[in-house]
Design a protein with these regions (language model features):
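Extended non-membrane alpha-helical scaffolds
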Residues: 21, 49-56, 61, 71-73, ...
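Short, surface-exposed recognition loops and adjoining beta-strand edges that mediate ligand/DNA contacts
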Residues: 17, 23, 27-31
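Non-catalytic DNA-recognition/assembly elements of restriction-modification systems
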Residues: 1-16, 32-67, 189, 198-240
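A short beta-sheet element
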Residues: 84-86, 100-166, 173-175, 183-185
Length: 240
């Protein structure tokens, strides 16, 4: 069910904001109905007339993460959710709300990680580049992330799909010899399309929120069932 919902959500993004067939004022698909387009040099493509292209840093605040010292046990086991790329890799989910290890207030204060509000967009920026998730809880991350706090939190789903759609270009920004990493400076300058059709955009957000809410409920149910299974299996194996 979750995969079907995700296919719908992605299709909605592609159809409206990649092909530009969002509903015009008459409810007809904009570009297919002859909506005016103009060439944009930064994106190297046509976009609807009146739409803008900004730097990512003007659309969202971009935050780094960090790791508290692992030699001090007092830094770990608290109630602050701390996310690593491994968490995203293991969970394979559009949403993240818990990690393998929490950190304490002391751990948080001891390093340069940042607290990210609910609906921030997390993107792994090295080893590998491009795991993406939306935070459904206040979280912080290790240094394997660049995270985005949209200036308007209603933009988080659009930002999630925009980054996902452009992940190949973002990967190409990676530098480094041991493993490639995308720098905050390069992401700050990355272009983002700002939607000009405000009524259509509001409509799109309502549709996406509806899908996302269903997906998140299912994600939590699956996580609870998986936990239950993992606890019961050893007991069954031992004949209990």
């Amino acid at each position: 069910i979750n995969d079907n919902l995700e296919a719908m959500a992605k299709q909605l993004y592609d159809y409206w904001f990649v092909q530009f067939d969002f509903p015009n004022e008459e409810g007809k698909p904009y570009k297919s109905s002859g909506g005016a387009m103009v060439w944009n040099e930064r994106l190297k493509r046509e976009i609807p007339i009146g739409w803008q292209v900004e730097n990512l840093k003007d659309f969202a605040e971009i935050k780094n993460g960090a790791t508290p010292s692992t030699t001090d046990e007092a830094n770990y086991g608290g109630d602050i959710v701390w996310i690593t790329p491994k968490d995203l890799s293991d969970q394979q989910s559009k949403f993240v709300y818990q990690g393998e290890r929490n950190i304490t207030k002391q751990g948080f204060n001891s390093c340069s990680t940042s607290m990210l509000p609910t609906n921030s967009v997390l993107m792994s920026s090295r080893a590998p580049i491009g795991l993406i998730s939306i935070a459904k809880h206040e979280v912080c991350t290790n240094q394997g992330f660049k995270s985005f706090i949209p200036k308007d939190m209603n933009d988080s789903i659009y930002l999630y799909y925009y980054i996902k759609h452009h992940i190949k270009q973002i990967e190409q920004l990676g530098t480094g010899t041991t493993f490639k990493e995308v720098s905050r400076d390069d992401l700050c300058k990355f272009p983002i399309l700002v939607i000009g059709a405000k009524d259509a955009y509001k409509q799109w957000i309502v549709l996406q929120d509806e899908i996302a809410n269903k997906q998140f409920v299912l994600t939590k149910e699956i996580a609870a069932l998986t936990k239950q299974r993992d606890e019961l299996l050893p007991l069954l194996m031992n004949g209990q």
